[in-house]
Amino acid sequence: MCEFNVILNGKTQFKDVIYAKAEGGGVTVKNILGEAKEFKGCKIVEVDVSSTTLVLAP
């Protein structure tokens, strides 16, 4: 399985993400433990499987 680290403003904000959904002017992510975090006002700008990063921008 591939888990991603969520990067915002060059810093890791959330780890082990297996789900991401852009909705309502933001992005909701969930990790392997089922914990969720919403990044309001952000959008997904890059997904890199080789470096396991999901990059967000405001």
Predicted regions and their residues:
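Compact, glycine-rich, soluble single-domain proteins
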Residues: 5-8, 13-58
